[in-house]
Curated annotation (Swiss-Prot):
Organism, as annotated: Pectobacterium parmentieri
GO biological process: cellulose catabolic process
Compartments it resides in: Secreted
Region (Linker), start-end ranges: 335-352
Biased composition (Low complexity): 339-354
Protein's name according to its UniProt entry: Endoglucanase 6
UniProt region (Catalytic), positions on chain: 32-334
Predominant localisation class: secreted
GO molecular function terms listed in the Swiss-Prot or TrEMBL record: cellulase activity; cellulose binding
Annotated segments matching region Disordered: 333-354
Active site residues of this protein: E168 (proton donor), E256 (nucleophile)
Stretches assigned to the CBM3 domain: 353-505
Length: 505
């Protein structure tokens, strides 16, 4: 059950967004911006939700250091990123050291320019206090408190502002020793002026030690913990840390990642990057790529000399930039991206009547003998008339191996987990691969599926009634190698009781 705190609902004065001819754009003068759609963000049960209590995932890009390539941070470039790339969040990286804010406090004016642009464009913005070579955030704690007091005073009523108060603590700095005490003080400073905008806090070892933060979380309810990775350097061990942190109820935000190795060069490591992006998207974890710049490094999104104001063609994008743009566009549902929901035809279409419904499936968990069945599906309306979602029934067939009962969970749903209802049933004729099914239905609040539209991902997790391990290899609906969305006829869909997709066992 989703229990929402009372929230201060605040509005931005948003400019009218104009369309650009010849482009496939995410917004027009008739459609809502990300902030209009989601409003005030908060944390509930370790997940990022909008003001309606629906889970939301932010995807975007970060500037590089303002002292070096700050000219790329302006309203025109951010508008292009919103309209052509589909970003819903932008991160403005203000270094503290390395000729950053400490030596040049006027860089705060570029931060304010970026926030004003984000307010006008209706996108979320992360104000990043970019500690790095200074190792310990306490080195400039006094300056951080002054800076964030000003930012919170200016933007405490703007629901699109997010504060990142310690980019990458490193060296001998630990969560309990230095970072958490620092974060407590800076959070208090922010909360004295802004009661509820999100705060992101880094962890030790360049924001990799989120397991330490998860074990001793901050008391502020709207705090997320940053994890940073570079695909050529960091792999499964960090993904395992994310799973651990989430199991402890910690909210995770990947506020910086790159397609390169940790130096910013090498690669790009695109297969490794795709593994990471699939992992984050599967768990609904927000992410921001490094970086919007034309610097001579692999992780830069632009080639040397690219325009400072957007309008970039493919020739203006680096290999990394092309990949990241595709990933963001896919998440925003724009054409031309490498969309994870692009179907492949089933090898055995089956005998069910497809009608105007297509169901796509992917296996979320590659271990068929752990303690859970984890599956995800997406429904498409390929017809010409709207389909009322509450009329649909999705059935996932399995064999319970003699274990009674079931514990069912909705881990993710684009339509909102509160709009998904789960139960179990028994097929008319049991087989050695199917003596039960999980029934997934939609509440009336899910609305209708318009022609050409999709429900987006629904993730369901099924445990045996006694929480023992399961054996999925003999389950009718299980696809062991289906790790990306595929049209799947072994899960059925009924519309008002009539089979419209799939083949029953």
């Amino acid at each position: 059950m989703w229990l929402r705190r009372k929230q201060i609902v605040r509005k931005l004065t948003l400019g009218v967004v104009t369309t650009m001819l010849g482009m496939s754009l995410s917004f027009s003068a008739l459609s809502a911006t990300p902030v209009e759609t989601h409003g005030q963000l908060s944390i509930e049960n370790g997940r990022l939700v909008d003001e309606q209590g629906k889970r939301v995932q932010l995807r975007g890009i970060s500037s590089n250091g303002l002292q070096w390539v700050g000219d790329y941070v302006n309203k025109d470039s951010m508008k292009w990123l919103r309209d052509d790339w589909g970003i819903n969040v932008f991160r403005v990286a203000m270094y503290t050291a390395e000729n950053g804010y400490i030596a040049n406090p006027s860089l705060a004016n570029k931060v304010k320019e970026a926030v004003a642009a984000a307010q006008g464009l209706g996108v979320y913005i992360i104000i990043d206090w970019h500690t790095l070579s200074d190792n310990d955030p306490n080195t400039y704690k006094a300056q951080a408190k002054i800076f964030f007091a000003e930012m919170a005073g200016l933007y405490g009523n703007s629901p699109n502002v997010i504060y990142e108060i310690a980019n990458e603590p490193n060296g001998s700095v630990t969560w309990n020793g230095q970072i958490r005490p620092y974060a407590l003080e800076v959070t208090d400073t922010i909360r004295s002026k802004d009661p509820d905008n999100l705060i992101i806090v880094g962890s030790g070892t360049w924001s990799q030690d989120i397991h330490d933060a998860a074990d001793n979380q901050l008391p502020d309810p709207n705090t997320l913990y940053a994890l940073h990775f570079y695909a050529g350097t960091h792999g499964q061990f960090l993904r395992d840390r994310i799973d651990y942190a989430q199991s402890r109820g910690a909210a995770i935000f990947v506020s910086e990642w790159g397609t390169s190795d940790a130096s910013g060069n090498g690669g790009p490591f695109l297969p490794e990057s795709q593994t990471w992006i699939d992992f984050l998207n599967n768990r609904g974890i927000s992410w921001v790529n490094w970086s919007l710049s034309d610097k001579s490094e692999t992780s830069a999104a632009l080639v040397a000399g690219a325009s400072k104001s957007g309008g970039w063609t493919e020739q203006n994008l680096s290999t990394s930039g092309k990949f990241v743009r595709e990933q963001i566009r896919a998440g925003a549902g724009l054409s031309g991206g490498d969309t994870p929901t692009m179907p492949t035809e089933p090898t055995n279409p089956g005998n069910g009547t497809t009608g105007d419904i297509v169901l796509q499936y992917r296996n979320v968990d590659n271990n068929p003998s752990d303690d859970a069945i984890r599956m995800a599906f997406n429904i498409k309306n390929t017809g010409s008339t709207p389909i009322k979602l509450s009329d649909l029934q999705v059935r996932y067939y399995f064999h319970d191996d003699g274990k009674p009962g079931a514990n069912l969970f909705v881990d993710w749903a684009n339509v909102g987990p509160n709009n998904i209802v789960t139960s179990t049933g028994t097929p008319a004729a049991s087989t050695d691969k199917a003596n039960r099914y999980v029934l997934v239905t939609f509440a009336s609040g899910a609305g209708s599926l318009q022609p050409g539209a999709e429900t987006g991902e629904v993730q369901v997790r099924i445990h045996a009634g006694d929480w023992s391990n399961v054996n999925e290899t003999n389950d009718y609906s299980y696809g062991p190698n289906v790790t990306s969305y595929t049209n799947w006829d072994k899960i059925t869909v009924h519309d008002k009781g009539t089979l419209v997709w799939g083949t029953e066992p």
